[in-house]
């Protein structure tokens, strides 16, 4: 990011972000100012990202989930995100287009980055999601998905996989597009994330 340390967001990045997200110019500029206050270097570390994410969910423990979100957007694995990657991360976890979102969801669940998802990786992400759900909301969940183990079992069952099978990106996206129930189960309710983003700018 050429002008990451200056006070204004470059026109190119602003236009690209408006094109790829639903955020307004005003929102993006005000977020950029906040971003520079929190991260004067123009880059955000995993710890800083977790800390900002925690502000959105004061009643929950989003650290594990935030860590996985961070990993999935740190394309060059350098341990930092720039403002563009940061905004796209917030957008994808709250609003992104279905296909884009599913590609991202695959990378979120592919914890070891080997291009396939195992049942244990599904459980790891679902456990992180459960830490984001309040105990009251957990009580409202159906009996067959009210623990991380049950929910992971249900997701894996929808794909018709054996315990030691792997799931490719194509299978993951096709299966999820074909079954709205899987889509609901694999994500932390984006509506809630969206509400939080509107309530509290980073």
Swiss-Prot record:
Localization: Photoreceptor inner segment; Cell projection, Cilium, Photoreceptor outer segment; Photoreceptor outer segment membrane; Perikaryon
Ranges for domain EF-hand come to 41-59, 61-96, 97-132, 147-182
Which PROSITE patterns does UniProt cross-reference here? EF_HAND_1 (PS00018), EF_HAND_2 (PS50222)
| Lipid-modified sites (N-myristoyl glycine) | 2
Q: What is its main location?
A: other
Question: What membrane topology term does the record carry?
Answer: Lipid-anchor
Q: Does the keyword Cell membrane apply?
A: no
Enumerate the UniProt keywords alphabetically.
Calcium, Cell projection, Disulfide bond, Lipoprotein, Membrane, Metal-binding, Myristate, Oxidation, Redox-active center, Repeat, Sensory transduction, Vision
Know the name of this protein? Recoverin
- Gene name in the database record: RCVRN
